[in-house]
């Protein structure tokens, strides 16, 4: 079978290698000079290749459409990803949060391994401009879902087209029995993610869920963030509120920046943002999650007793990082010259509330150019979850970030690319 893979990224190269091992003839179209450029920026240049967890545990970390992955992840779980890369000569290690990295800490090693895996495919430097679609004379029909009792006899229309190839941006036509769109999303456009796959999908009448940046830093006009820029907080709890109601909570690390907040906690929280024109978002940071409010009050009382003659700011030396101390005192509203032994119980209670509920207003998402992934994409309702084949066009398939499936940080999104690519290759007939 002639297989055409559009996109030479993580999903594309994985699919190409797997299809080669099924005995197929494979061509990869890649419009960038070098394939898999985005791999080099993942995991801060170290490439968090997957997460060492079970398929069941994995699905709890998938933010959008986890059920779509039941089949592909079951057939190609993280353990198989690790086994594959080790067979390609990559030594792996498991770090905190079961994140899997190459021992070398070099993303280039993962990129080279994928290129070796796809060795034998014809990698062509060209983009994809247009799907070659042939209308089906009598679209095949599929029975309506059994859970729809109102229309038991109604038929759902089958594919209206057959995809027989792609016309490249060069004008050249590439004919194929199976065309896989694995072009990624819109994040990190300098690495080649320019949204071409969305345009191709729409040519076959696919529904597109609006692509938005996800796993991205958050913008806050709160001046306190800029005052603390560069401050990294560890072992804090971040709770994201939408219109006053908590919608996300997690403990970990975060960072204050000149434009707002960033770091792992922030990236995960960003995937829960909806329409920012319709909703108000705030982040609340618990600076001492290991202590209850009463325990923190007692801790503050002890510290202030030991540092009785220090100023209010000086008395915070054991409680907060130095760059946060003056900001805390200002938000606390206490006279900086106040001595620790002059601070009232009521003021200590106010300090407890500030430390347990440090508020950051969220004004915007970071842009797509700096997002780790794109949320949104080709609607999974129109893609077969076992084969990755389009329900709109026979011979057309999708894998990876181009699909409306995304997860938190931790190696989950690359694993989604790998397992959907493997499902495509392993179901070719």
Where are these regions (language model features)?
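Glycine-rich active-site loop/strand segments that organize a redox cofactor
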Residues: 46-94
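A glycine-rich dinucleotide-binding beta-alpha-beta segment and adjacent secondary-structure elements
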Residues: 124-127, 132, 152-154, 326-406
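A conserved short coil-to-beta-strand element within the FAD-binding core of flavoproteins
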Residues: 124-162
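An anion/pyrophosphate-binding glycine-rich loop and adjacent beta-alpha core
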Residues: 33-41, 49, 55-56, 91, ...
